[in-house]
């Protein structure tokens, strides 16, 4: 079989337009010249029968991150179909952290049950192999995110950008045991920079892919850190304790909880993002008046220090390095937006003070960081160097090349 004849089925779940890398991976598979790819949205019920009829026709079946990142509800009807495949199965895994929304164990159990041939991890390879050690029939391969240069390119020259430092991220929940990103955003929002800088940092709103690209092109710089948590567990033991604690508190208050995958939550998934932004606040107030809490609000409101002291203080960190590079880092490089980032490993892809300006975790070198950031020559050299490096080795085309070579 020639590699150019790889018939590929790409399964994805389209119920959000906020995470741009979902579209970037899908586009990369669909446009790769060595694949004949068909993409199917598993959230559309009418596709189930078609996939069942044709599953034996594919050399490669790919489960993108979206099929298991937040729920297994949509992929569950495909479980028996995937077992009947003839081709190889590659399963990506979305959100490789322990969350009350969906357990890592349930994702691992699904992958084991369908006997995935390959597991594509966003984590460093050592961490991925540790996490999926029970999936003995699967090969764990490092497939971190990358750059889609068609979606994220340098449109506005750096000297013409109107925002000095801009950033977007949802607040990290306390149940991750990791407050680095929240602390980073809080520090930059409050620090008295001299000279003063124009900041646009927000943890309450997000962009779709095109909006995120436009925003980055307005920013000379952005701030970030590695994704994930130092407290990754295969059995979700700690987050289950936090979940039981949080639910017992709500019960004591006589409050009901809108839980994950309940009917109201399923309906909410399909509300357009712009409408969600409009109705979220009044809906939250209405639910509060009924003494009803949405599960995510409960975890957002948990105090980090109290949660850490109660649940994380006396447990060891993950035995392997479990934080990772994320799509946001590649998006910024694509738009030539200079990154100020906390020190970390970044999957050994990005090098400190070569591809980004490294900030110590206690922020003690902020003066030196800003001197480098405000030096226009240093700034331009860094973004150009990072851009050329990523374009040469770390686009989504390169990632799908690696998938093709597995066959």
Range-by-range predicted roles:
Residues 2-136, 146-154:
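Extended catalytic core of nucleotide-activated donor transferases of GT-like folds
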Residues 3-16, 20-42, 91, 111-112, ...:
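Catalytic binding pocket for nucleotide-activated donors in carbohydrate/polymer assembly enzymes
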Residues 20, 175-187:
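A conserved mid-protein helix/loop that constitutes part of the nucleotide-sugar donor-binding site
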Residues 66, 170-175, 198-203, 311-321:
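Surface-exposed cleft-lining segments at the edges of enzyme active sites
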Residues 147-161, 210-211:
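Acidic anion/phosphate-binding donor-loop and adjacent secondary structure
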Residues 185-199, 249, 274, 293:
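A conserved nucleotide-sugar
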């Amino acid at each position: 079989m020639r590699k150019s004849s790889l018939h590929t089925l790409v399964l994805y779940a389209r119920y959000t337009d906020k995470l741009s890398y979902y579209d970037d991976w899908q586009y990369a598979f669909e446009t790769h010249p060595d694949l004949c790819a068909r993409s199917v949205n598993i959230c559309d019920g009418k596709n189930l029968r078609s996939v069942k009829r044709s599953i034996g026709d594919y050399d490669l079946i790919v489960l993108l991150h979206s099929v298991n990142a937040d729920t297994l509800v949509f992929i569950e009807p495909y479980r028996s179909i995937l077992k009947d495949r003839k081709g190889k199965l590659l399963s990506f895994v979305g959100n490789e952290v322990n969350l009350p929304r969906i357990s890592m164990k349930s994702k691992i159990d699904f992958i084991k049950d369908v006997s995935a041939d390959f597991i594509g991890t966003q984590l460093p390879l050592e961490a991925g192999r540790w996490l999926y050690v029970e999936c003995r029939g699967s090969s764990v391969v490092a497939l971190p995110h990358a750059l889609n240069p068609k979606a994220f390119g340098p449109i506005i020259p750096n000297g013409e950008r109107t925002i000095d430092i801009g950033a977007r991220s949802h607040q990290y929940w306390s149940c991750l045991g990791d407050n680095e990103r929240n602390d980073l955003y809080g520090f930059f929002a409050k620090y008295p920079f001299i000279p003063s800088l124009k900041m646009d940092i927000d943890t309450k709103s997000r962009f779709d892919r095109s909006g995120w690209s436009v925003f980055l092109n307005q920013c000379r710089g952005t701030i970030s850190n590695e994704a994930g948590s130092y407290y990754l567990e295969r059995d979700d033991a700690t987050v289950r304790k936090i979940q039981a604690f949080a639910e017992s508190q709500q019960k004591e208050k006589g409050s009901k909880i809108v839980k994950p995958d309940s009917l109201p939550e399923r309906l909410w998934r399909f509300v357009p993002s712009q409408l969600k932004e409009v109705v979220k606040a009044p809906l939250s107030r209405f639910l509060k008046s009924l003494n009803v809490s949405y599960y995510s609000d409960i975890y957002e409101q948990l105090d980090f220090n109290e949660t850490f002291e109660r649940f994380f203080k006396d447990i060891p960190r993950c035995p392997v390095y479990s934080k990772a590079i994320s799509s946001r880092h590649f998006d910024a490089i694509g738009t030539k937006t200079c990154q100020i980032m906390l020190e970390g490993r970044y999957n050994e892809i990005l090098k400190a003070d070569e591809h980004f300006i490294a900030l110590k975790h206690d922020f003690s070198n902020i003066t030196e960081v800003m001197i480098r950031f405000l030096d226009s020559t240093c700034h331009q050299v860094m973004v150009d160097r990072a851009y050329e490096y990523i374009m040469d080795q770390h686009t989504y085309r390169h990632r799908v090349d690696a998938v093709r070579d597995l066959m």
